[in-house]
Amino acid sequence: MEQLKMRFKKLTVLTPRDKQTELDVKEEIYDAVIIVTFGPALERLLRXAFLLARPNSAVRVIVRDVDEAKVLREVKLAGFLRVMKVNNNAWKAYDCEKPNVSVGATVPLKLPHLNKKSNVWNIKVMDDDLIDEDTLLKDEDYVKPIKESHEEKLNFCGELKKRRPCKNCTCGLAEIVESEKVVAQLKPGKSSCGNCGLGDAFRCSACPYWGLPPFKPGEEGRIKLETVNDL
């Protein structure tokens, strides 16, 4: 102890009896700090020693009945460097050193200067990005479609060319063929004797108007309502 006092101008010893808190400690006023403890107060005394010691000052930790691994861990966690065991008796001693750092000191951070401007999204709409709708149309799109006839639309039975509807026709071809037959029957026939309009008494056996009432020339196939008797 005397050798340490001669070596260092300002030296202090911390024991578990020291009840001073971190707020009461005067920071960085000692050239050397000695800690003597049984172990339970080791963590608290190491924090106080870090505040009391000046940068690059020496700290000796003297402990008893404390596991060596725990001592080394606590000393490093407190911030001390270059931990070395100097005594392996009942009282074990460890020397360490406070780094060249002042308590509460600030260190400037050298950040790279970004001269390049950050890319900003360009929300301006460019005309080049717009698509001309006329370019999407092809030549065949301008051709007027041909309207299909009614008979072509009804060509579901596959028998339009033969003019024969199927047995159970549901597409309407059977009705078309039947209506064409009725129209053909109502078309004026050619008279061979010239007496068709006079009545059945003057008509020949092959007259197309057989059974119809007499009519004037040009009124073939027409029935006058006044000639029909109400039943």
From Swiss-Prot:
Component of the cytosolic iron-sulfur (Fe-S) protein assembly (CIA) machinery. Required for the maturation of extramitochondrial Fe-S proteins. Part of an electron transfer chain functioning in an early step of cytosolic Fe-S biogenesis, facilitating the de novo assembly of a [4Fe-4S] cluster on the cytosolic Fe-S scaffold complex. Electrons are transferred from NADPH via a FAD- and FMN-containing diflavin oxidoreductase. [2Fe-2S] cluster binds at residues 157, 166, 169, 171. It comes from the Eukaryota. Keywords: 2Fe-2S, 4Fe-4S, Cytoplasm, Iron, Iron-sulfur, Metal-binding, Mitochondrion. Belongs to the anamorsin family. Residues 1-113 are annotated as: N-terminal SAM-like domain. It is found in: Cytoplasm; Mitochondrion intermembrane space. GO terms for molecular function: 2 iron, 2 sulfur cluster binding; 4 iron, 4 sulfur cluster binding; electron transfer activity; metal ion binding. Residues 113-143 are annotated as: Linker. Residues 193-207 are annotated as: Fe-S binding site B. This is Anamorsin homolog. The C-terminal domain binds 2 Fe-S clusters but is otherwise mostly in an intrinsically disordered conformation. The N-terminal domain has structural similarity with S-adenosyl-L-methionine-dependent methyltransferases, but does not bind S-adenosyl-L-methionine. It is required for correct assembly of the 2 Fe-S clusters. A motif (Cx2C motif 2) lies at residues 204-207. Pfam families: CIAPIN1 (PF05093). [4Fe-4S] cluster binds at residues 193, 196, 204, 207. InterPro entries: Anamorsin, CIAPIN1. Residues 157-171 are annotated as: Fe-S binding site A. A motif (Cx2C motif 1) lies at residues 193-196. The keyword Isomerase does not apply. One of its GO terms (cellular component) is mitochondrial intermembrane space. One of its GO terms (biological process) is iron-sulfur cluster assembly. Monomer. The lineage of its organism: Eukaryota, Metazoa, Ecdysozoa, Nematoda, Chromadorea. Its cofactor is [2Fe-2S] cluster; [4Fe-4S] cluster.
